[in-house]
């Protein structure tokens, strides 16, 4: 059984270490999160967004596609293909908040993953970039 132990401060988790037996579960979760992010970004690109956002989303989609392929190889199966793209807000401010929420979740998974698998630290850097972009957009 995979059990999460954390030393908590008043603000947030100071240190989270997952035992090695959690690796498969974490990789499976990250695969699902990356698939969700990829489909949401694809749907977002079809909306009326500012030009700088469209450029970022195009690069972001490439990043997510690469992460997804990497995780599919690691877990030994492909993520489930969606028949249609998810519905996302049409107004950019609401869409930015939705994307920020998904990316913030992905960042938390990436932190856990990088602590367990330092060889995957580049994914953490990508997630920090994505979160940073959407943080700036919603401020």
Report residues per predicted region.
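Non-heme di-metal
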Residues: 2-139
